[in-house]
Amino acid sequence: MRDRLLAAEKVKAIDWRDDALYLLDQRVLPFEEVWHRYTTAAGVAEAIRTMVVRGAPAIGISAAYGAVLGARARIAEGGDWYPALEEDMQLLADSRPTAVNLFWALNRIRDRLMRVKNGDNPLAALEAEAVAIHLSDREANLTMAQLGADLIRKHQGNLQTVLTHCNTGALATGGFGTALGVIRAAHLEGMIERVYADETRPWLQGSRLTAWELANEGIPVTLNADSAAAHLMRTKGITWVIVGADRITANGDVANKIGTYQLAVAAMHHGVRFMVVAPSSTIDMEMASGDDIIIEERDGRELLEVGGQRVGADVEAFNPVFDVTPADLIDAIVTEKGIVERPDTARMAQLMSRKHLH
C-alpha cells in the first residue's frame, strides 16, 4: 500500500533546497501556482502569519526551517548568536498561537541545539533536524492513511460517503495529508463512493484547496456550503466525518478549524462516525482539556468585506479561526502511533506511551 500511496501523491507545498525555503502560496490557489522563496526567519514567520502556508503540520515544518535560516544569519553575525536566534524562534512561535505543531517543532530545534558538542557544526545539525522533522511527518502521514483506511473497513465494509472540513491534504502537511490522506488511501482500496467537502469560510480552504486536490486525483468530490452539513448527513447517507486537528489535549478534546464542533454535534445526532486524523506532534499532553486552548481570532474584515466593499458601517464581526470539539463527540483519533477509539485521558496517555509504528 505504501508504494501505491506514494504513486498517488501529486501535490506538495514545502520545498527546502539551495539554503532557502520555498512555499507554495495557498492564498491564491487554485487560480495561480505561485512559489515564494524565503531566506530569513522573519520572512517565514510572516508567511505563517499571513497564511501563505497553513495546516498545523506544514506550519511546524516551515517554522523548523525558519529557525535554520535564523541560525545561519545569526552565526554569520558572529559573537554570542544564541540569544538572537531565540528572538527569531519567538517571532516564529508568535505567528500562529493555536497550532501546537509549531511549538513542538521549535522545541525540537532547541533540544538539538543543546546537544551540539564542541567542534560540531551547529548549523548543519539544525538543518538535519529540520529535514528530519519534515521527513518524519511524511512517514507519519503514510502510516495514518493506512490505519484510518483499516478503521473504515473494520466498521463498515460497504462504499463510504464521507464529509470533510477545511484542508488536510498534502498542502497542509509534509506530504500526502492527514484526514485527506485517509480518504486517499480508502479511495485507492475502493471504499470511497463520494467525498463532500465543506467550503470552509471565510478562507474557503475546502473549495479552493480540498476540492482541487481531490479532483486532481480523480476522487469523486462535491462541494457544499458549511451550513448544508447537517442536511447532508440526513439526506445523502454520510457514513464518516473525517477531519484533522491543530491541537489535541490530554483528555482527547480537539481544536480544529472553526465549524468542526458543529459537525461533531450533527454527526452524533445522525449516528455518523467522527474521525480525527493528526500526527502525535499535534497532541499536547501538558494541556488538560480544550478549555485551556487559546483560540486565535483573525481580522473581522475577513467577514465584513465582500468584493472589497464593507457590508455595514456599524456591524462588528466575531471571527475565531478554531473551535474545540469535546472528546465525547469523537469516535476515533488516528495518529502514527495508533488509534484511540472513544478518547479519554487514560486512553490518550496510553497512546502517547507507545513507540511510533513507522
Curated annotation (Swiss-Prot):
GO terms for biological process: L-methionine salvage from methylthioadenosine. Pfam families: IF-2B (PF01008). The record marks C166 as: Transition state stabilizer. One of its GO terms (molecular function) is S-methyl-5-thioribose-1-phosphate isomerase activity. Pathway: Amino-acid biosynthesis; L-methionine biosynthesis via salvage pathway; L-methionine from S-methyl-5-thio-alpha-D-ribose 1-phosphate: step 1/6. Keywords: Amino-acid biosynthesis, Isomerase, Methionine biosynthesis. This is Methylthioribose-1-phosphate isomerase. It comes from Pseudomonas syringae pv. tomato (strain ATCC BAA-871 / DC3000).
